Each structure stands twice: as structure tokens, then as C-alpha cells.
Regions:
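N-terminal alpha/beta PP-like core and its mobile active-site loop of ThDP/TPP-dependent enzymes
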Residues: 1-186
Length: 186
């Protein structure tokens, strides 16, 4: 259906696919992957009910500041908001629970938009991004020279600030020497 070209592209490029039985499981798996590895998780779901089923996992990642990308299918741009099969306002639904939610409007921008969505998952406070890719955008072929491909390493998200190692060492020393240590963290 709506995401068949993404599935085939992953297979053609040797990208491992973990197929699950339900879209909610896919979004929770992407969240879990990010929690376990520290790298953004990614799930790809079909349009309509596939995207709505994934909402809970995305909302969970949003509240917990977990970096993940959900890519959802959509009907063709020419049929968008005309009641076509599984045509729902995915971006509108995702905006309140993501850091970034957008539709890819041209095949030329696919790589750029995927890169942008991934970057946003780790920009400032971590959190999920949503990218909707319509069927006709996925079906179109363009020469590589027309594709907007971001330069590797040119753009990067800011990272979370970590405590100064010297301060951590001082705190550990104070706690280890205390008679009755108590730590209150918030």
C-alpha cells in the first residue's frame, strides 16, 4: 500500500526490517530501541489507521523525551483531503505530540526532509518527529542530480548538556565521605 516503496527500498539497500503485527507495537519498538541504544528509533507505518495506531507510542516518546522518527504513508497529493483511502490529517494529529511534523511535498526533498526530521529528534530536548510521505512522492523517480541531499556532517543537532565531570567527581567525593548520605534529585 502506501509505504510499499519504502519497504522495497530498505530491502534493496540492505536495511534490516523488523516487521511487527501492529503499528502501535512498531512505535513502541522505536521508542524502546532509542531508550536502549541512545540512537533515534524509527518506525514506518501505513496511512490512516496505521498512523493513528502509532499515536500512543509517539505520545509516550514525547512525554519521556525519547528521540524517534515515525514515517507515515499518505494518499497522493492530488487526492489529499478528498476522502481517498485512509486519508487523514496525520500532520495535524501529530503536531501536539512531536517536535517536528511535516509532509514531504516533492520527491526532490525526500532525503533532505528525512534528515531534517531525524535531526530534530535530538535538537535541544530530545523527542519524536513525524514525517508523512504521500504515495505519488514515493512513486516518482528523479535524477540523482535533482535530489536535495544534505551534506554528511554539515548539519548536526545540538546535544544535551552533560554535567561537568569535575563537579560530578566532587559530588561523588562528598557523598562517599558523608556519615549519612542523602541525595535529593529532581
Amino acid at each position: 500500500g502506501h509505504i510499499f516503496d519504502i519497504y522495497n527500498g530498505c530491502l534493496n539497500e540492505g536495511i534490516k526490517i523488523i516487521d511487527v503485527r501492529h503499528e502501535e507495537v512498531a512505535s513502541h519498538a522505536a521508542d524502546g530501541y532509542a531508550r536502549m541504544t541512545g540512537k533515534p528509533g524509527c518506525a514506518v507505518v501505513t496511512a490512516g489507521p496505521g498512523t493513528t495506531h502509532a499515536l500512543t507510542g509517539v505520545a509516550n516518546a514525547f512525554r519521556a523525551e525519547i528521540p524517534m522518527l515515525l514515517i507515515g504513508g499518505q494518499s497522493s497529493l492530488t487526492q489529499h483531503k478528498m476522502g481517498s483511502l485512509q486519508d487523514l490529517p496525520h500532520v495535524d494529529m501529530m503536531q501536539p505530540i512531536t517536535k517536528f511534523a511535516a509532509t514531504v511535498m516533492s520527491t526532490e526533498r525526500c532525503a533532505d526532509m528525512v534528515s531534517m526530521a531525524f535531526r530534530e529528534t535530538r535538537n535541544g530536548s530530545f523527542g519524536p518527529s513525524f514525517l508523512e510521505i504521500p504515495r505519488d512522492i514515493l512513486d516518482s523517480s528523479i535524477p540523482m542530480s535533482k535530489a536535495v541531499v544534505p551534506e554528511t556532517g554539515k548539519y548536526s543537532a545540538s546535544s544535551k548538556t552533560l554535567a561537568d565531570p569535575v563537579d560530578v567527581e566532587k559530588a561523588a567525593d562528598i557523598i562517599s565521605k558523608a556519615e549519612r548520605p542523602c541525595v535529593l534529585l529532581g
